[in-house]
Amino acid sequence: MSSIKGNKLEEQGPRPLQPTPGLMEGNKLEEQDSSPPQSTPGLMKGDKREEQGLGPEPAAPQQPTAEEEALIEFHRSYRELFEFFCNNTTIHGAIRLVCSQHNRMKTAFWAVLWLCTFGMMYWQFGLLFGEYFSYPVSLNINLNSDKLVFPAVTICTLNPYRYPEIKEELEELDRITEQTLFDLYKYSSFTTLVAGSRSRRDLRGTLPHPLQRLRVPPPPHGARRARSVASSVRDNNPQVDWKDWKIGFQLCNQNKSDCFYQTYSSGVDAVREWYRFHYINILSRLPETLPSLEKDTLGNFIFACRFNQVSCNQANYSHFHHPMYGNCYTFNDKNNSNLWMSSMPGINNGLSLMLRAEQNDFIPLLSTVTGARVMVHGQDEPAFMDDGGFNLRPGVETSISMRKETLDRLGGDYGDCTKNGSDVPVENLYPSKYTQQVCIHSCFQESMIKECGCAYIFYPRPQNVEYCDYRKHSSWGYCYYKLQVDFSSDHLGCFTKCRKPCSVTSYQLSAGYSRWPSVTSQEWVFQMLSRQNNYTVNNKRNGVAKVNIFFKELNYKTNSESPSVTMVTLLSNLGSQWSLWFGSSVLSVVEMAELIFDLLVITFLMLLRRFRSRYWSPGRGGRGAQEVASTLASSPPSHFCPHPTSLSLSQPGPAPSPALTAPPPAYATLGPRPSPGGSTGAGSSACPLGGP
């Protein structure tokens, strides 16, 4: 009892290094020393007064240990990071880098194999991404069948019109041309060349840019004959017998400082182009509205018109004049209130026309063909007779079968096309929708106005701009032919600026020809045409022609572009490659991303630590000392348990002298804390007795 009381008195006073009462008993001390994680038997079965005297001590606050996991935790080294990654990742082959670490040869083999596999996979990734960003397209072809809107049909007389308003100028041009042909080729027709008071030389001198013969040096043996660089018209009629001369006319700039000859090796081409050049100048003097054109009627050119076995009327066509092709008529254009529909294919369910092919007002020096010219196009597209038309022969029935096709292109990154031309840097001068031909002609007209100061008469012009005439623009011919060369070589950039439309409707045509009318039927056919139209056919077969235009079938083909590699396809291909080389899933990719992130963080922390150790050392100032102090304060408390070296646990003795003891430890560390086995011992926070 006295020992108990002594112990109680010692508990009331400060006892920094006194053991618990149960540890003072001999036999029980050995049991506790042999099994430290278990409870002391003396405390469990001892005096009740001892238990009451000690009482339950309040639980001390838990201090964080190295084994506890923080909210944000990073590995201490690269080695630890890679070992953790290889042990826990789902990527195949990574575990072999750790399992075979006792065999360096296997470790090296698997490391090289893993890196090569990784490189091969990302090489395939590069190919897949390269294919995706090249934006390839696939062409999808669909066949559809439905009622079809009949396209617009434009047909021209191939007979340049002799305007009454410029009759005198045209007759003067014909006389000068006849004189030129006589001087150059000794040709005289005696029909257009009339006698006058002026001589031939004086008559030719009244017209600028006369046609003349030019001597050129003979080409070397075996060399290819080429046209002048300034010429823009191809030699359609090659010369049979080579001579050391060419035919052309001279063109100069405004101040006559630069001149060139527009030459041709064929005299036919030279005369036609020279006559055409002067004919354009005469046409430019015509007023905007001509009464002679307004009086023109369809019956002067077309004898009969039927569509789906029903006769046409005046509301089904519109009329315009072309400088080279004469009077033109467009059937079923956008101005027609009720567009024609084709519900059946075949020659009897289309457009049938009987045409007059005679050329009473023919200008022989401007056009050398006879018949008619026809073109099939969309309702909202202009008729470019030079680009898409073809000629009809007199005395022949021409049957033209059509097949409709549509093409839908992809724009943006997949193709260079435009939806409506609003993003094209060329103003549309035509009253129609955007097409590539519309843009090209508008671009040339803009360049013509900018460089030459006047507009070309074959294309529409903006307001307040005059058509070219050498009476007002003396050097426009020089400018025009120079511009033609730049246009053909795309120095003007028109072919680059004018992109293709994203949606195009075209008609594939195929023609068949037959003699019409036949020998046995031509008498009554011509008699009926003469009685019906009050017109006498003089040359019979050469004065008429017939054309049939119809759908071959109502099936039409739709060609549409679609992306060959979409985002879904790309992800699928990437997943296939990842599974092929590593047999992993999307979560494995997340693991790789986590590994890269941890590598960056560890590298950053190591650099930061090195920076602090170099520039924030304690000897460099107060800031370094504060850093060290904060580092010590943030470190976990050490479990320091000093004890005298001469203390014997088997024999009790007096308390050690305060001079031999260490500074008092943190009392919170003397409280119970969980043991590795999960139980709480009274002496778990103290060092084992008997140690050095």
UniProtKB/Swiss-Prot annotation:
Keyword Cytoplasm: yes
Disulfide pattern: 156-328, 252-259, 305-312, 417-502, 439-479, 439-498, 443-494, 452-479, 452-502, 454-468
Chemical reaction(s) catalysed: Na(+)(in) = Na(+)(out)
Residue ranges annotated as Extracellular topological domain: 130-585
Gene Ontology molecular function, alphabetical: ligand-gated sodium channel activity; WW domain binding
Pro residues composition bias: residue spans: 653-666
Region annotated Disordered, chain positions: 1-67, 627-692
One of the record's GO cellular component terms: cytoplasm
Entry keywords, A to Z: Cell membrane, Cell projection, Cilium, Cytoplasm, Cytoplasmic vesicle, Disulfide bond, Flagellum, Glycoprotein, Ion channel, Ion transport, Membrane, Sodium, Sodium channel, Sodium transport, Transmembrane, Transmembrane helix, Transport, Ubl conjugation
Location of region: Gating release of inhibition by proteolysis (GRIP): 198-266
Main localisation: membrane
Gene Ontology terms: biological process: cellular response to acidic pH; cellular response to aldosterone; intracellular sodium ion homeostasis; multicellular organismal-level water homeostasis; sodium ion import across plasma membrane; sodium ion transmembrane transport
Bias kind Polar residues: ranges: 628-637
Record comment: activity regulation: Originally identified and characterized by its inhibition by the diuretic drug amiloride.
Topological relation to the membrane, as annotated: Multi-pass membrane protein
Location of this chain's protein in the cell: Apical cell membrane; Cell projection, Cilium; Cytoplasmic granule; Cytoplasm
Residue window of motif PY motif: 663-667
Residues in the signal sequence: none
Stored PANTHER family: AMILORIDE-SENSITIVE SODIUM CHANNEL SUBUNIT ALPHA (PTHR11690:SF124), AMILORIDE-SENSITIVE SODIUM CHANNEL-RELATED (PTHR11690)
Family to which this protein belongs: Belongs to the amiloride-sensitive sodium channel (TC 1.A.6) family. SCNN1A subfamily.
Function: This is one of the three pore-forming subunits of the heterotrimeric epithelial sodium channel (ENaC), a critical regulator of sodium balance and fluid homeostasis. ENaC operates in epithelial tissues, where it mediates the electrodiffusion of sodium ions from extracellular fluid through the apical membrane of cells, with water following osmotically. It plays a key role in maintaining sodium homeostasis through electrogenic sodium reabsorption in the kidneys. Additionally, ENaC is essential for airway surface liquid homeostasis, which is crucial for proper mucus clearance.
Subunit structure: Heterotrimer; containing an alpha/SCNN1A, a beta/SCNN1B and a gamma/SCNN1G subunit. Interacts with WWP1 (via WW domains). Interacts with WWP2 (via WW domains); inhibits the channel. Interacts with BPIFA1; the interaction is indirect via SCNN1B and inhibits the proteolytic processing of SCNN1A and SCNN1G and the activation of ENaC. Interacts with the full-length immature form of PCSK9 (pro-PCSK9).
Protein name per the record: Epithelial sodium channel subunit alpha
Organism: Pan troglodytes
